[in-house]
Design a protein with these regions (language model features):
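Active-site capping/gating regions of soluble enzymes
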Residues: 1-176
Length: 176
């Protein structure tokens, strides 16, 4: 009765296969990652109405907001660590880094690993999950084509705005 949905895993890569939404190991790679991340955030913020329309059907509209489905309002979840990084940049304060906590499984024979700092809340409509976004509002009968056309076009526009600003800057590093 409540319908079902699917997750649209979305990322952006170069023609050589480099994932531009994968956080980098060096400051330069992180600057590139943050630029593309901010372009996606801007795109979703500016065009949330088109993203919402791209998944609208009678059955899906009934499903959204109920029974562990994402809400009908488009919002982004980045996870605590990435949110803290962006807040540090915004306030021009040093990023202190998230404290890595180990998972406590209660089983000694399994290897120890750190708790994931990205999204584990499966009801977030548009969530960053480590090296990609999951757009979780699509109904099971929806094609991903319309949502991807809207998302790709919106991100392309944001990247064009950023490229124009960076190409015209006298100091690239400061503008970035």
């Amino acid at each position: 009765v409540n319908g079902s949905g699917k997750h649209n895993n979305w990322s952006i890569a170069t023609d050589a296969g480099q994932n531009l939404l994968s956080p980098g190991a060096t400051p330069y790679e992180n600057a590139q990652f943050l630029l593309f991340l901010c372009a996606v955030i801007k795109a979703v913020d500016d065009y949330q109405d088109l993203l919402r329309i791209s998944v609208a059907t009678a059955g899906n509209d009934h499903r959204l907001g109920a029974n562990e489905a994402p809400p009908a309002v488009v919002s982004i979840f980045l996870g605590d660590e990435l949110n803290a990084v962006l807040e540090a940049i915004e306030t021009d304060t040093p990023y202190k880094g998230a404290e890595k906590t180990q998972m406590k499984l209660g089983v000694d024979v399994l290897p120890k690993f750190n708790r994931d700092t990205t999204d584990r809340n499966r009801t977030s409509p548009f969530a960053f999950t480590g090296n990609k976004f999951e757009f979780r509002m699509l109904g099971s009968s929806n094609s991903i084509a319309c949502a991807n056309i809207m998302l790709n076009s919106a991100v392309a526009e944001a990247l064009k705005i950023y490229a124009d600003r960076l190409e015209g800057a006298s100091d690239f590093e400061t503008a970035l």
